[in-house]
Design a protein with these regions (language model features):
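Surface segments flanking catalytic/ligand-binding clefts of nucleic-acid enzymes
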Residues: 2-148
């Protein structure tokens, strides 16, 4: 709702406060602080919750990177200090030949600029969240050790 600009954060909070006594509303109140209109899909929001639960540094959302040819690329999640990105790849959005070409070009161009890209699919987020956190944490730790 926030991404589609159907409501503002204040509207969301007001609606939540009007739900006093409803089952599950306490959990909703705890999670609303993590709502971010920059998430472009429900799975991106779920992935952010996995990152939070896993104790990862919060990434920049919808981060823009300009490659060596001047082309602008936007990534789902970025940790700029570590030159690390993570991209959620849904089967619906990324399954066509055109989308596959675009994704491969994007990863190649980002790698040419020194970025590491971690792909994520629904199973990473929903079935193996600890493995996903470990993969990202390993890359973040490696980048920190190189910088230090």
């Amino acid at each position: 709702m926030l991404f589609k600009q159907c409501c503002e954060p204040a509207d969301l909070c007001k609606a939540i406060n009007e739900q006093k006594g409803r089952r599950g509303i306490v959990k909703v109140r705890e999670l609303v602080e993590y709502a971010d209109g920059r998430s472009e899909s429900p799975l991106e929001s779920e992935a952010r919750l996995v990152f939070i639960d896993g104790g990862l540094l919060m990434p920049e959302l919808q981060y823009e990177i300009v490659d060596r040819c001047g082309k602008l690329w936007r990534v789902d999640f970025a940790w700029p200090d570590a030159m690390l990105v993570a991209e959620y790849e849904s089967m619906e959005w990324h399954a066509t030949p055109e989308a596959l070409r675009h994704d491969r070009m994007k990863v190649a161009r980002l790698q040419e600029c020194g970025w590491t890209s971690i792909p994520m699919v629904v199973d990473d987020v929903r079935r193996y969240p600890l493995d996903l956190v470990a993969r990202i944490a390993a890359h973040l730790n490696h980048a920190t050790s190189l910088a230090g």
